[in-house]
Amino acid sequence: MPNTLTVDLGHRSYPIVFAADVRNNVRDQVAELTTAGRKVAVFTDEQVASAQVGALEAMFGSSPRLAFAPGESAKSLASFGRAMDFLAAQKVDRRGVVFAFGGGVIGDLAGFIAASWLRGIDFYQVPTTLLAMVDSSVGGKTGINIPAGKNLVGAFHQPRGVFIGTDFLRTLPAREFAAGMAEVIKYGLLGDAALLELLERAPLSFVSPELAGVIRQCCALKAAFVQADERELAPEGGRALLNLGHTFGHAIEQVTGYGVYLHGEAVAIGMCAAARLSAKLGHLGGADVARVDAVVAAHRLPVKLRTPLVLMDLLAAMARDKKVRAGMPRFVVLRKLGEAVTQDDVPAELAAECFREVGAS
């Protein structure tokens, strides 16, 4: 039997359904929508479509679907335009509904498609990666990348529901699973000491008995941040704390063209850089930084860049980050392991030192 967690946003509240196998739950939702005369359109990627042929048929039947090439490159204006043409050809009207079936890239892209088509139609998330399950499928952030930066074009558009089925992780490559663990580690560093200690005792894997509970726990933490500060407008802290490691990580992704590091891998390096920044600001000690490095490495994630990147390129990319305020990058720093704050008056030379310490040249 599935269990449910509600993201409480008043009249825009929605359920997150958890089960090992959510195919019947999704199928029932699709049947309810189509019986009511609402057209369903499905967006996925070619890799998921190949690995989950049976699930696609079981959940969506004959509903039209469009598959994009896998990877971050799909979050593009070209993909967005292709999706618009697809929805037009399928004659999807304002009562139409989009389903995102895939990882974080598909969720971000399909959500933005739904936010934009006819000025906004309903959509549902059916995440198939650990990263999407614990983070990107919840909270309504949607968007695409442009050459100037990651997620610079997008919208806040909450889903009508999220279906999290851990059985989808059976076909997830080990590298993708590890990338998702970066976001799990993030929650432990932000404020869940028990979660951090669990991860330090033994790395989580697909067969870990704690996995389903950890996924639900991460979603509950994410929901709490979203409920308190949905549009990331709090002057300090708030939802922006979820960007721990992302200011450094997004710069790494942009400089490498989104094809070298998975998002979670870049965030992992970014969290290690953020720990070093926190130490330079007088918050963490060397033992704390070593703990961050150790839990990241234990989950088969990079602590440092695999090959050096040009420091000035990274700093330039950071300056274009969407979180910049008054020309200054905004960082999430750790006062201690389990407590974070936002800070936007970080001297550029400190950020540069942190990049060097994780492998920039």
Curated annotation (Swiss-Prot):
Keywords: Amino-acid biosynthesis, Aromatic amino acid biosynthesis, Cobalt, Cytoplasm, Lyase, Metal-binding, NAD, Nucleotide-binding, Zinc. It is found in: Cytoplasm. CDD domains: DHQS (cd08195). One of its GO terms (cellular component) is cytoplasm. Zn(2+) binds at residues 183, 246, 263. GO terms for molecular function: 3-dehydroquinate synthase activity; metal ion binding; nucleotide binding. It catalyses: 7-phospho-2-dehydro-3-deoxy-D-arabino-heptonate = 3-dehydroquinate + phosphate. Gene3D superfamilies: 3.40.50.1970, Dehydroquinate synthase-like - alpha domain. Its cofactor is Co(2+); Zn(2+); NAD(+). It is an enzyme of class 4 (lyase). The keyword Transport does not apply. Its EC number is 4.2.3.4. It comes from the Bacteria. Pathway: Metabolic intermediate biosynthesis; chorismate biosynthesis; chorismate from D-erythrose 4-phosphate and phosphoenolpyruvate: step 2/7. One of its GO terms (biological process) is chorismate biosynthetic process. The keyword Secreted does not apply. NAD(+) binds at residues 104-108, 128-129, 141, 150, 168-171. Binds 1 divalent metal cation per subunit. Can use either Co(2+) or Zn(2+). Catalyzes the conversion of 3-deoxy-D-arabino-heptulosonate 7-phosphate (DAHP) to dehydroquinate (DHQ). Belongs to the sugar phosphate cyclases superfamily. Dehydroquinate synthase family. This is 3-dehydroquinate synthase.
